[in-house]
Amino acid sequence: MSPSPAERAEDLRRQIAQANRAYHELDAPEIPDVDYDRMVRELEALEREHPELARADSPTQQVGARPSGRFAEVRHAVPMLSLSNAFSDEEVADFVRRIDERLGRRSLQFSAEPKMDGLAISLRYEEGHFVLGATRGDGSTGEDVTANLREIGDIPKRLNGKDWPDVLEVRGEVYMARADFEAYNERARLQGGKVLANPRNAAAGSLRQLDPKISAQRKLSFFAYGTGEVQGGELPDTHSGTLAQLGSWGFPVSALCRVVDGTDGLLGYYRDIGERRDGLPFDIDGVVYKLDDRAGQQAMGFVSRAPRWAIAHKFPAQEQSTTVEAIEIQIGRTGAATPVARLAPVAVAGVIVSNATLHNADQIARLDVRVGDSVIVRRAGDVIPEVVSVILDRRPQGTTPWQMPTQCPVCGSEIVREEGAAAWRCSGELSCPAQRKEAIAHFASRRAMDIDGLGDKYIETLVDAGIVKGVADLYRLSRDQLLHLKLVLDAEDPSALAAALKLHLPAEGSGAVLNAVLKLDGNDPGWRAQALVQPASFEWNTKKIATKWADNLIAAIDASRAATLERLLFALGIEHVGESTAKALAQWFGDLELIRHLPWPLFKRVPDIGGEVARSLGHFFEQQGNQQAIDDLLQVGQVRISDAHAPSAKLREGLDLAQLLVESEIPGITRLRAEKLVAALPSAQAVLDAEHGQFVNAGLPDDTARGLAEWLDAEGHGAMLLAAEKAMRQILAKAPALAEIVAGPLDGQTVVLTGTLAQLTRDAAKERLEALGAKVSGSVSKKTSFVVAGTEAGSKLDKAQSLGVPVWDEDRLLAYLAEHE
């Protein structure tokens, strides 16, 4: 029996009130906006049809609404910085307040503009001619995509007008308009080609094509939003004026840019653009606010990798409700078992979402997500779908809490979780095929071993076929295998592959191979791996198959055999070990054999390596499978370390058994207590052989003595302490004496570089200063020893002068380097 209008209205008011409280008071929305709006509209209709149901406290009467490596590297003369984000009105108000307090102004003007969802690039013009275009990259170094950028009609090849600077770098966003995106995909569908995922990926992928003709086919657009390096000329003293000037020189500038006053102006602009967002011809994911006057920008300066005078105000992530059909786990490169919700497909933020991350088991427990639940799915940052909450009112009867599986779904190994860790992991290490694919892809990546040309699809097929079972197998690949692989991957189905193979197999004896290929099921996702079975011989017809790709890949594999220690350590894919940590390990220990057999507490000798990273390193090297993989690399792959050296003498500082006990994180063991213990028990073996009473006699409190005894009794701790003592002796034997360290003339001094140097690149100057012992910093303070100022020096020079920090010009720097190097 259907409820009466009065009953339905009351039920709607209850649900809306509950949703309002969850959203506004608890900051934990239980339903997506689309469901909330639907309920409000239904209640409005009921109150119109039945005026007697209208009440003063009805939600419909309340005022207010919620706010809606294949390219050459290019070193950016001026870094392409990122922006801090604001997600609320309060954060925007705080941004304005910080500027007001720092500058002491009561009236602030800002330039506001849409935040394009594309790819940031830098365009360099010399004497008015476009000479170089680069991607953002890591902010300091990007990729040279000049040829592809020349295919974009919006980008002027020569500047209009006059009075442009001798050197002008223009920063902006390459994007694909929605209409062009839809048109391209429609053509691709009709022609049986590849359909692009979304406009942002389309723009990024197009610019990274080796063939500029592909960029031309995928019609791209451009908006300018700022400048980088400027030499031999001046720009207007406001950001808005600079944009207008860029427009006069031929650069497209968004017609949605506005100059607004204060917080109210910013929020008004934000809401205006938010309301127009869906009707715009391009995708945006927020708006950007910049202090308009350059003098104020210079006074505000920068923090970390972002300016203090600008911020991105992101739109709320779009949400929708759907049903959880299953919860599965995916195994990542480092073995992390990540739960993934398989969803009834739903459109969210313009794309169909059928999977969403649940992050980890603790998150599932916190949300209590169950199979069969109705959930809210959000595309966080408009990119990554995630389950944010469960709609408990819709939970069906009979659901049960989800439990983490005990075995890896890929290799069957046990799934374990380290004490205190959030993530569960497959214990199969590199023997797990799921980890193997990701590990090999990471190993071959540009910043690791830099095996250019070995893409994910090649790795996946090689692993599935059993040809590559570990990273060392990459060094066994032959030219014939790679050419065969290319044929298999290029073929749309087994029939097409058989036709291609027929051109290259000898006429006699090829029938069995071709028949085997034709029997493969093209609907089976693994048919390509099954087809990758090397025939007895190939007679490659080089007129009909391109061999350059295979030759280049073999050359890249061979070149990677000579690796720096930091590259190899990073390439191993050890959890928590990024490039900077790998570099530090290489600098401090210098030797792979030492590192791979080092107990984890000794890794903490390296500055900035704490217990979590040290334990991760120890765990990795404790696994026999990982040690075997390293052995295979050295023996089968013939990989060699090109820059091995003795451990740093600085490792000697304070390195003794007492420090080992402290760094082993034994409960209650401080440096003072460890020294007392070692004075009575001077070796690791003596500590292991001692009993509780001896620990007390050595000066330990009773509870600490009991804790030490329990720690030593725990599995593996005693062996680890003995191994750590042995490794400590090896380090002390190999490391130079501290007295042998020759202090550089700039040891202990901090130097800041600013402006453009004529005879040195900034990287070269930094390297030479560091070689003399200096620390090169990015910011000026009272502790700065001196500042080297080139041309176009900016706020750093001003700050140095205000603080009385000595300033050197380039000539003085060059003279000093010549004298002391």
From Swiss-Prot:
Pfam families: BRCT, DNA_ligase_aden, DNA_ligase_OB, DNA_ligase_ZBD, HHH_2, Nlig-Ia. One of its GO terms (cellular component) is cytosol. It comes from the Bacteria. Its cofactor is Mg(2+); Mn(2+). The active site is at 115 (n6-amp-lysine intermediate). Its EC number is 6.5.1.2. It catalyses: NAD(+) + (deoxyribonucleotide)n-3'-hydroxyl + 5'-phospho-(deoxyribonucleotide)m = (deoxyribonucleotide)n+m + AMP + beta-nicotinamide D-nucleotide. GO terms for biological process: DNA repair; DNA replication. NAD(+) binds at residues 33-37, 82-83, 113, 136, 173, 290, 314. Residues 741-821 form the BRCT domain. Zn(2+) binds at residues 408, 411, 426, 432. GO terms for molecular function: DNA ligase (NAD+) activity; metal ion binding. Keywords: DNA damage, DNA repair, DNA replication, Ligase, Magnesium, Manganese, Metal-binding, NAD, Zinc. InterPro entries: BRCT_dom, BRCT_dom_sf, DisA/LigA_HHH, DNA_ligase, DNA_ligase_AS, DNAligase_adenylation, DNAligase_N, NA-bd_OB-fold. PROSITE patterns: BRCT, DNA_LIGASE_N1. SUPFAM superfamilies: BRCT domain (SSF52113), DNA ligase/mRNA capping enzyme, catalytic domain (SSF56091), Nucleic acid-binding proteins (SSF50249), RuvA domain 2-like (SSF47781). DNA ligase that catalyzes the formation of phosphodiester linkages between 5'-phosphoryl and 3'-hydroxyl groups in double-stranded DNA using NAD as a coenzyme and as the energy source for the reaction. It is essential for DNA replication and repair of damaged DNA. PANTHER family: CHROMOSOME TRANSMISSION FIDELITY FACTOR 18 (PTHR23389), DNA LIGASE (PTHR23389:SF9). Belongs to the NAD-dependent DNA ligase family. LigA subfamily. This is DNA ligase. It comes from Stenotrophomonas maltophilia (strain R551-3). The gene is ligA.
